[in-house]
Design a protein with these regions (language model features):
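Noncatalytic regulatory segments and standalone regulatory/sensor domains
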Residues: 169-180, 189-232
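Active-site-proximal beta-strand/loop segments in catalytic clefts of secreted hydrolases
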Residues: 63, 82-83, 137-138, 156-160, ...
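Predominantly the structural core of cysteine protease catalytic domains
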Residues: 96-182, 191, 230-231
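Active-site-adjacent structural segments surrounding the nucleophilic cysteine of cysteine proteases
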Residues: 1-119, 159-161, 166-170, 179
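Structured segments of extracytoplasmic/periplasmic soluble domains
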Residues: 61-73, 82-89, 124-131, 145-150, ...
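Envelope-exposed proteins and targeting segments
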Residues: 54, 151, 182-184, 196
């Protein structure tokens, strides 16, 4: 990219984080900022399958990573104990709604479970942090910009990190909703604009896992554009 006019190179270093050395280029002639090409935040990895196992606990485990990164000492198990829950299935045959609480069992050790969406996760995060922001509904570029600013982002995706076709319709107390057992939650930790990849801490045990940018953005959209971040 050819920049016309005076250019100021601003180098910001955060211990433990990898940032492209030409991190921000400010073009004084037109006031535009050229975004960082690559960012990888050093977010602590928490594995939902480590003891005590949370077979269905990707959402609370990913939230624990975000909170830990921001200096908040909380475990996945504590979050699992404190997340609002709803039954997997009521006596009348209706299912719980993940917008109201975690559907079923978070641990998955004794009964079925599905997952939970951004609303209950936001409420849970507010119990531990003052500065919690719900980006739900924002386009994916906005999410990436928050990571660029140094904030790991909790989000809902799929186990394929791409759109899926295995949705089914559930009757809930709030009406019909479409759900998928492929629903997954991760912590977005970085990106590479040249390689067109997103980096995530996957609570299945993968730190800074590299996934395709376009596929991940499409899954983000399919799953309702759900995202939350925290600041100190």
């Amino acid at each position: 990219i050819l920049l016309i006019g005076a250019v100021v190179v601003i180098w910001k270093y955060t211990p433990g984080n990898i940032v492209d050395k030409a991190s921000e280029l400010f073009n004084e002639s037109d006031g535009k900022v050229v975004h960082k090409k690559r960012v990888v935040l050093n977010v602590p990895l928490i594995n939902q399958m480590d003891d005590p196992k949370l077979y269905n606990g990707c959402e609370v485990t990913s939230l624990a990573m975000v909170l830990n990164y921001n200096g908040i000492d909380v475990t996945k198990s504590e979050l699992a104990d404190n997340i609002e829950t709803v039954p997997f299935q009521y006596d009348n045959g209706e299912h719980g709604n993940p917008n109201d609480g975690f559907v079923g069992s978070v641990s998955g050790s004794t009964s079925a479970g599905l997952g939970v969406y951004h609303g209950p996760i936001y409420k849970l995060a507010k119990q531990y942090a003052d500065n919690v922001y719900d980006l739900t509904g924002s386009n994916f570029d906005t999410v990436v910009n928050k990571v660029e600013e140094g904030h790991p982002v909790w989000t809902i995706t799929t186990t394929a990190f791409a759109p899926v076709s295995d949705f089914e319709s559930w009757d809930t107390p709030d009406g019909k909703i479409d759900v998928t057992y492929s629903e997954h939650s991760v912590c977005i930790t970085g990106f590479d604009r040249d390689k067109r990849v997103i980096y995530v801490n996957d609570p299945y045990g993968y730190k800074n896992r590299e996934v395709d940018w376009n596929d991940f953005a499409a899954a983000y959209k399919q799953m309702g554009k759900q995202a939350i971040y925290v600041t100190k």
